[in-house]
Design a protein with these regions (language model features):
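Mixed-charge interfacial surface used for oligomerization/domain docking
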Residues: 3-5, 11-25, 30, 82, ...
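N-terminal glycine-rich anion-binding loop in soluble enzyme alpha/beta folds
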Residues: 5-64
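Hydrophobic residues in alpha-helical segments
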Residues: 53-54, 78, 133
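Glycine-rich phosphate- or other oxyanion-binding loops that anchor nucleotides, phosphorylated ligands
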Residues: 57-58, 64-90, 99, 143
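Short beta-strand->loop
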Residues: 88-89, 113-116
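Acidic, metal-coordinating catalytic cores used for nucleic-acid/nucleotide bond scission
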Residues: 93
Length: 286
């Protein structure tokens, strides 16, 4: 049986250690910042982007890679006869899936999955696919099952500031200004059927108390959460805040809790201080 390679856009936000352990091949997005082209989380970090914004309102340009870039990536992975299952950032958020699909159209043994999510909402799907690979499943069978994983993957997060959304034209400046004055922190939900984002509950108060309510609200929506693993993914919160959220999840019986930092692509849109919990359910649910 040919070797099966699991590959994913860098926006799946798995840590370097996870990518190495599970042998996931990462495809980095490009970040254009201050006139230079960078590779996401390779030669630029979210903190550099945040610093640039607060220094002189510099904003990065992010975007999906071209079909040709994907074609080259897939060609390198399949050169020895390997088969590839590749996970993309959700098609509702980016043209990455469309471009990767175009690249794979005339290539044998390359299967492209629309993650219909973002960040470790896709990372969870990638880990599930890796376990299928390690169990000896073929690339075609993995792709068939993986194409439905988004129905069980749940992603949400809470913003600490709306400045970056406003600067990027994703919410009115006045709304962001008033949100800051009123200490409003909007919850953002990812629709796991379409992959689109929508505004959820609006929280007010200090970050730690807001995150405590957010965790409680989020977990209360589901009765069949898989307790084997859960992600805490953030765009730069203090160790104390991350530890407090971890404690909440430990108290609720989660066995493995991963803490990862969001990629530049994700972080540049949500701004610093954003945090989310991302997990799977046993059965498909919105």
């Amino acid at each position: 049986m040919p070797n099966v390679i699991i590959s994913a856009d860098s926006t799946c936000d798995l840590s370097p250690e996870q990518r190495e352990h599970y042998q996931v091949r990462s495809f980095p997005f490009h970040i254009e910042f201050r006139g230079r082209d960078h590779l996401d989380n390779i030669d630029i970090t979210p903190q550099v982007l945040f610093d640039g914004f607060y220094e002189d309102k510099s904003l990065p340009q992010t975007g999906a890679c071209s079909p040709e870039a994907y074609r080259q990536h897939f060609a390198e992975l399949t050169a020895d006869g390997s088969k590839v299952v590749h996970f993309n950032l959700g098609s509702a958020l980016s043209s990455a899936y469309e471009n990767a699909n175009a690249a794979a159209a005339d290539m044998e043994g390359v299967y492209v999955i629309d993650g219909k999510s973002l960040s470790t909402g896709i990372g969870l799907q990638v880990l599930a696919a890796c376990r299928m690979r390690d169990a000896g499943m073929s690339a075609a069978d993995i792709a068939r099952e993986a194409s439905e994983l988004h129905n069980r993957s749940h992603a949400s997060f809470v913003l600490d500031t709306m400045e970056f959304l406003a600067a990027g034209g994703r919410c009115p400046t006045l709304v962001a200004y008033l949100g800051g004055k009123l200490s409003c922190r909007p919850g953002i939900l990812v629709d796991n059927q379409s992959g689109a984002m929508k505004v959820g509950k609006l929280y007010r108060g200090k970050q730690e108390k807001v995150l405590e309510r957010y965790v409680s609200d989020t977990l209360a929506r589901y009765t069949d959460i898989v307790k084997d693993e859960i992600f805490i993914t953030h765009s730069g919160v203090s160790d104390e805040v991350a530890a407090a959220v971890r404690k909440l999840l430990e108290e609720r019986g989660f066995r493995t809790i991963y803490t990862t930092t969001a990629s530049c692509t994700i972080s540049s849109h949500c701004g610093p201080g954003t945090l989310g919990i991302l997990f799977m359910t046993e059965t498909p649910s919105a």
